[in-house]
Amino acid sequence: LLQRLNRIKQVGLSSVVYPGAQHTRFQHSLGAFYLMSEAITQLASKGNFIFDSEAEAVQAAILLHDIGHGPFSHVLEDTIVKGVSHEEISLMLMERMNREMNGQLSLAIQIFKDEYPKRFLHQLVSGQLDMDRLDYLRRDSFYTGVSEGNIGSARIIKMLDVADDHLVVESKGIYSIENFLTARRLMYWQVYLHKTSVAYERML
């Protein structure tokens, strides 16, 4: 299931506008997995206790977070199966894998569904500052050549901490977060919602 992502482009039909954007969901998933490993190490170094089982589970959750993507990435998301998001399909596939693996993904699924007491673990997978976004913004920026999306993901991860089981950012990291939010907005304007890409998506 994971290897299937090798055949799905990360930015769908944006390669029509940006020919260099040939990177895949598989590459992105590996990148997000790496950033998650860095984030777990960083949070643990600040005295936040994370069991090895929790670290493995949250890494599994981020590695599998995109397995529900179909052909052309987001383009056909609401066309093939109406009203069902790729996150829901990812969850369905994870639950199927969990049955085949005798429950070894149970904790990862709990985290993915935000049903685990340590809320910050889910926020690392799916939140305003999750490892998914930190990876795809830099990756998409690099392969499209749109430099505005090039964020300092390593700096942001160093600024992360936990308070009351929620993910927080140290005050000295506010400037990096402002840059991150600006970069995300600019990438939507210049890449994800580019008029030519959107026109091709409508035709498809």
Regions inferred by a protein language model and the residue ranges of each:
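Sequence-structural signature of the catalytic-core scaffold of metal-dependent phosphohydrolases
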Residues: L1-A60, G68-M203
